[in-house]
Amino acid sequence: MVKKIIFILYILVLVCMAAATIVEKSQGTDYAHAHYYGAWWFILIWAVLAALGAFYIIKRKVKCASTLALHLSFIIILAGALLTHISAKRGMIHLRIGQPTDTYMAQDEEQGMKEEKLPFSLCLQKFEAKMHDGTNAVADYSSKFTVTDGDDKSEGEVSMNNIYSHRSYRLYQSSYDEDGKGSVLAINADPYGIPVTYTGYALLFISLVWMLFDPKGGYRKLLKSPLLKKGALMTALILSMGNIQTLHAESATGNLQNAVLPKETAEKFGELHILYNDRICPVQTFALDFCKKIYGARSYQGLTAEQVLSGWVFYGNTWANEPFIKIKSGEMKTAMNLPDYASLNTFFNREMGGYTIGQYVQEYYNGQQDKFHQQAADIDGKIQIIMELREGVSLKVLPYTFTKNVKATKDHPFIKAGTTTWFSPVDKLPQAVEHQHALYIRNVFSLLNGDVKAGNISRVNEFFVKMKKYQEVSSGNSLPTATQYKAERINNAFPFATILFMANLTLGFIALFYTIYRMTKKKEIKVLNIALPILLGVSFLALTFGLALRWIISGNVPMSNGYESMLTVAWFVMLISILMQLRIRIVMVFGFLISGFFLLVSHINQMDPAIGQMMPVLNSPLLSIHVSIIMMSYALLSLTFICGIMGICMRSHGDELRDLSRLFLYPALTTMGFGIFIGAIWANVSWGNYWSWDSKETWALITFMIYAVVVHTQSLPVFRKPLVYHIYITLAFLSIAMTYFGVNYFLTGMHSYA
């Protein structure tokens, strides 16, 4: 009876958490917290579940120490969460330079926000927003203040990922005033909940590792399973791939023969630096992104991306007639009878009122966001990119470093002595820019355009060489290092995701058919036995090199967006496969196919997005550890998913595949547990809240709890049956899909990409 109640409450908790994330999307975060996460009944369910779980463990007289420690850690974590909910104080304090403040706006579930008094006062002395050199991308925020506590005075400072503590209060940088003379700090006082919760985390980390090494634990027993040593696993995997459009290079049409720069000249243009996506990068990078975003490919009719970009800059009228804008299938394409690729001039017609989709775009921003209007907005976005390029707005290739004290302006709010700003030829220049530099910035492209139109290519080449020297002299410290520049040029030359997904899927199918041949014919091909593991290693090294390049270029661990995280999952899949293939040969097939599909997803869905600066709060070692460990768990769970599909299709090998799947499942749960709660520690360090019920962390917890069910084979013997296990483990992967894709693109929260 107790077991049934526990099972019902367990499912109820999962359903409530999932429902709350969906409700949050429609009703808002405050509503979800008030009526779900913070509701008395939700807390009661957790409390009863924990109490009954403890009672059940005692009743069953569980003697495995690692199991006892693991479940005890969850009870301690829940107790800490309850203490935080009951006793913690949270709020925001607004400081202005020179004005002492001893009150803050506290969060209150009933009244919303109410003013509370602090036992000390704060007086802001200085606020500073530090920028990445030459850009308006913030590197860090910093607030310096004086703390007055009775007769005692002390100096304090907070910045992103750097907190200040006084008594039981902790202060975090949250926001700032636009005039730079005020700062908003988050304030948190939780003297009881955090120590208890952290104790639970520590015990959890110890017990998760202990679980893998405990001689009495299920994992060590699993490793001794004779089924894993058979190696007689056969698979029949049906893989379907959608039509992948390959754009064959063609020679440039006659219309473009006189509207492009020679390849060598365009390459010199691509070697210049530009301020793009809040960082300084080669113009080549901007050109590639321009082509991919507008045309959907890295080149156009045999022309390089640099030739395409320079063509639009210098021969815009000719290029406006080229079918360069890719039109996706949709209601608008059908209604307006648009081709697959349309020209810019297609959307400008005087007889139809000028901008033919302008009305639909306006309706979209007024709230009509159906599929027809969404496509109008998508096309409008591409057209705006082209228009900004033709007008020169996006060509921020002309740097200037201010040497004197200057006043910030509305157009340039962050300029001061020693800072570098990158201008376009049409930007409004501050008066502090020296006259000669101002003339050069305003006129260089006009002069360059004259030589291009006159066909004086040698002078155009000289212009680009001199412009590069000007950038080196006038850019201060804002240029990337020589190593970063070379790394980006290499990264631009080789689309790693595209090359590797084709290679890995091809080799994966070869490995799959060879495995079937080997198991049915009882014969081996020595060449493939040697070549396939080597090629897996080569693919792994190539992906490692690609990720290393992105790391060098950005200066951050390459996990900052969906594209990079897909690459990281593929990397972990291949790493695990390489480490395990000597013992279990079938893992190599998994390694090729799963990594290939992750790379395919990154290629199709993301098209290699621009590398950008990381938000200051994300620039933390704890975050890098959190994301990398979570990615490792996803990689392991993807292997259990494949085992599940195979187990359903090939029931004669269900026992072996179940044990193989569980071999991946235990370390997957360990890494996921580490990843979730290291993320909680990072959140507490960064903004003072170790668990905020964000959609991503909620679904990560749901996923952890769903997968944890199947390791309880003693209390739930039904999961010893191979078919039941495989069906459950296959369906469980839907929670991974929801955690990764559903939250990122459909739900709300700090992790959402939508």
Predicted regions located by residue number:
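Solvent-exposed, non-transmembrane regions of integral membrane proteins
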Residues: 1-754
